């Protein structure tokens, strides 16, 4: 009986410690990448969902992307994959023939420890395809007439 009691108390204490450590992980995570692009038609390429297959590696058949708003300098989208919805926005600033494109995803997490600990790998999971996509976008825009 003592071993069962010790095991039960150990599981409770371990769970509380894991929960308290998870409180140190933020509940809002932003994954962001940016690139400088020479060209004036960056806004139109990003705002055109039909051109995304030419440059965006994250845009595929399993992800549903909804365009929420397209304004000068800002394209707001909502990405849905299975049951997860994530805002993914493009901010575009033009200056002296160069456009700075910032692409970011905002993850809002619940208090669950497994969600918070899982968010630690988001940058490694989303960052490289975002960088490759932005480089593809740069090649597409700079090589277009």
Summary of predicted features, one role per range:
Residues 2-61:
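Hydrophobic ligand-binding cavity/cleft-lining segments
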Residues 39, 49-95, 102:
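Extracytoplasmic/periplasmic/luminal assembly and interaction segments
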Residues 80-139, 143-145:
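Beta-strand/loop substructures that line and gate deep hydrophobic ligand-binding cavities in soluble
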